[in-house]
Amino acid sequence: LALHLIKLSVGTTGVDDLDAWHHDPRAQGADGLPRHVTRMWPRREAEVLDGGSIYWVIQGLVQCRQRILRLDEVIGGDGIRRCAIVLEPGLIRTATAQKRPFQGWRYLDPRDAPPDLGRAHRNEESLPPALSAALAEIGVI
């Protein structure tokens, strides 16, 4: 079973904002694929690369995911080895789920991952974060 990662998308206001960032050349590697560079390399790499995704927490709510294609080594200008999480282009919207702030990324068990939204809902506008949070808090979403 694939193992997922979960990560806060700091400074992002919504799914469309994250998507726009991933189209910016600064968020892409030489191959044109979006990536997220982090200091920590997943020790459970084989499980993550067996179909895992990164679930994005935007303003306190898990709202979307991206499939992880590979992990690339990146050496920063400071000589420190980092991990570039190379992502499949395009975001897959998920059911929203509240998530408290945390640092870095965490493993996410597939049983705890919010389900993808059905095809009928994928192109719908996201609810405002405050409304989504309020609905999630009372268990509506």
Which stretches of residues belong to each language-model region?
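Short, extreme N-terminal leader segments that mark the start of a protein/domain
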Residues: 1-20
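Positively charged, polar, low-complexity stretches
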Residues: 18, 30, 35, 45, ...
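Well-ordered alpha/beta subsegment
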Residues: 104-109, 115-141
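Short, well-structured hydrophobic secondary-structure segments
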Residues: 24-65
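A generic structural signal for short beta-strands and their flanking turns/coil linkers
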Residues: 4, 50, 81-83
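Amphipathic alpha-helical interface surfaces
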Residues: 18, 51, 64-70, 127, ...
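Aromatic- and Lys/Arg-enriched surface recognition patch
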Residues: 67-114
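Intrinsically disordered, low-complexity regulatory segments
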Residues: 2-3, 20-23, 27-28, 96, ...
